[in-house]
C-alpha cells in the first residue's frame, strides 16, 4: 500500500529501513535522515530549482536577480543514478494564472500590492527549470 507523509525532512516520523522511495521537492533535506528511513536499494528522488527557474519573475522582483546556484552533490551512502534538467517556457493566458504562480513563491509575501500589479502587467512568461536527481541507497557494509 502507498502512504504519503508530509513532515520535517530532518526528523521524519518514520521507522528506520522501512521506505522504498522518498521524494524531496523544493525543500531542504538531510541525507542522513533519508539513509536512515530508506531500505537498502531504496530510491531518493529530489527536485530542486535549476539556474533559470522563474528568472523572468525574479528579474521583475529584484534589481539584481541571481540565478539559482547548482552544485555537484555528494550523498554518503548513496549512488547517484540520474542528474537531469527539465527546462521549458510557461506562457500565461490571463492575469489569474500569473497571480496563482506568484502566490506559490516566497516573492508574493514581500510584494506591496502596487508592485504586484506592475509585475502582473509585465510578466508574459517564465522559464520552468528543474534539476531532477535520483539516488539509490547502497547496502550497508560491515
Q: Where is each model-derived feature located?
A:
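Active-site capping/gating segments
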Residues: 65-99
